[in-house]
Amino acid sequence: MLFRSWRFYWGVDGTEGEVILKKGDIASFPTNMFRGFQNVSDEEALMFVVLGENDPGVITWTPKLLKDAKESGMVLMNDNSLIDTEKQKITDETKVIQPLKDNELESFDHYSSEDIEKFVIRFNDKDQHFVDDDHYQSNKIINYIDQFQIHDKSFTPNIPHATGFSLSLLNGKSAHIHEYKLEKSEVYHCLSGEWEIDCDGDKVVIKEKDTFSVPKNSLRSIRQISDHDGNLFIIRQTN
């Protein structure tokens, strides 16, 4: 989930492909690939990232990044800490991350820009993906990833990635979802509008860029209360 413009690029040398994404765009990048990103707007930008499963694992760095870091006096350790060798000594060389060898690099997957576009849904194209919620006629929903179900209605995902979480967008000027309860983790992230969340009788309002982590097993409801269309991302644990 993005605010402003971001460039995403991939491959061991960062030249296999790239895509420019803007506010409200969604991309789900496959695992087992090198990727990088940078803010390409003229202003401060925000990127909200959801990592699959409970354990995101460790970061695998490209050999060039490790080489550039070492030349600047910075060393990456296997606990993902960063050591400035001008200020701190490395007490155990075995914990320094070593560059991957050529045969190890061959195990990573490769994607063209056209391949990755299949895993991108742009906000400007949202009308192609919206599904009207028959239960709430004021709601439109896009389900991006994994199965999303609300009040016995299921929404099919647009991106075929098994991530351990579902990602959906609730849209509408009067959009709302009546009370429901979940045993698993759920997070709301506001793209636009103002959303009133009632959680076990306590109310809070979130606005653009705000995030709310819903306590497990709580009874919650949400509704859009601004005078304009609102867009709310719903991220839900599925595994």
What is the role of each PLM region?
Residues 1-12, 162, 168-172, 180-197, ...:
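Short, conserved beta-strand element in jelly-roll/cupin
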Residues 2, 76-166:
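A short, N-terminal "cap"/entry segment at the start of jelly-roll beta-barrel domains
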Residues 10, 18-20, 38-39, 155-161, ...:
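Short histidine-centered beta-strand/loop micro-motifs
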Residues 63-79:
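Glycine- and charge-enriched low-complexity intrinsically disordered segments
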Residues 149-155, 166-183, 216:
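Conserved short histidine dyad/triad with adjacent acidic residue
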